[in-house]
Design a protein with these regions (language model features):
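Catalytic domains that recognize anionic headgroups
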Residues: 1-261
Length: 261
């Protein structure tokens, strides 16, 4: 997000909702009915390249508008090294402009907490994200009715969580058993992506029900993709930089712009 987007949001006083589908693969989104529907009403970016094939550096780059080699978060382990006094984040710009700012995510390492009025970390092994985030959209609607602009960051972590439990924990990057079962890996991922489609459909319906499209900019992104065993040596993400992890998607939805790709 560059300075022009920050100015557009503040000058027109639109709400901002960012939804990150953690581990969302571009090839699945291109074939998905739910994501194709998003493309019909958004500016769709099908050639987005993530800054890093893992969550924290990718999202730190997004929220700060700067790559990790400058902002300090250039490694999976460098969230704490983010130069928060040198790089003002989108959250801080909006907070300074009077926005109510709220983040809901599975780890406090995902993005800087500076500028957030509320920064909630949920238990990814227990949470019902469809219900939880539905409730948050309802909460934001109440803010909007009180003439309070808001910035809501929602992190959909369910793909990541199941891959962590089913792939990252039992296997390593050289486990022949994993790479020998490509069809099983594909099915596992496709089942998880299908649930993310249901989540996106729910979220869209909720935003429609509360009439928030007109007064909001909605950005739906993937932080990185996930391997299903394409290349021996990478069972999930973060080891290599092939298309299946670094090519992501972004859907920019605003009543100010017509849909296009």
């Amino acid at each position: 997000l560059n300075l022009n987007l920050k100015l557009l949001i503040v000058m027109k006083k639109k709400n901002l909702i960012i939804v990150c589908i953690d581990g969302g693969r571009l090839d699945r989104a291109l074939k998905s009915k739910a994501f194709k529907h998003l493309a019909t009403k958004s500016i769709f970016f099908p050639q987005t390249i993530t800054y890093a094939p893992y969550t924290n550096s990718a999202i730190h780059a997004l929220i700060s508008g700067c790559y990790g080699n400058r902002n300090g978060c250039f490694s999976y382990w460098h969230s704490i090294k983010f130069k928060k006094f040198e790089f003002k984040t989108l959250t801080e710009y909006l907070h300074d402009a009077g926005y109510y700012t709220y983040a809901d995510l599975h780890s406090d390492l995902v993005l800087p907490n500076s500028g957030f009025d509320e920064f909630e970390v949920f238990d990814e092994s227990l949470v019902d994200l469809k219900q939880r985030h539905s409730n948050l959209i309802e909460k934001m609607k109440a803010k909007n009715e009180d003439n309070q602009n808001f910035f809501l960051y929602l992190h959909y972590s369910s793909i990541h969580t199941e891959i962590m439990n089913s792939v990252l924990k039992p296997y390593n990057n050289y486990s022949e058993e994993y790479f020998a079962n490509r069809k099983l890996n594909e099915k596992r991922y496709d089942d998880l992506f299908r649930i993310s489609e249901e989540y996106i459909e729910m979220l869209g319906k909720k935003i429609t029900d509360f009439n928030l499209w007109k007064d909001s900019i909605v950005l739906i992104i993937s932080d990185h993709g996930i391997s299903v065993g394409e290349k021996f040596g990478e069972r999930a993400y973060g080891a290599f930089c092939y298309d299946y992890t670094i090519k992501t998607f972004a859907y920019y939805i605003s009543s100010d712009f017509e849909a296009k790709e």
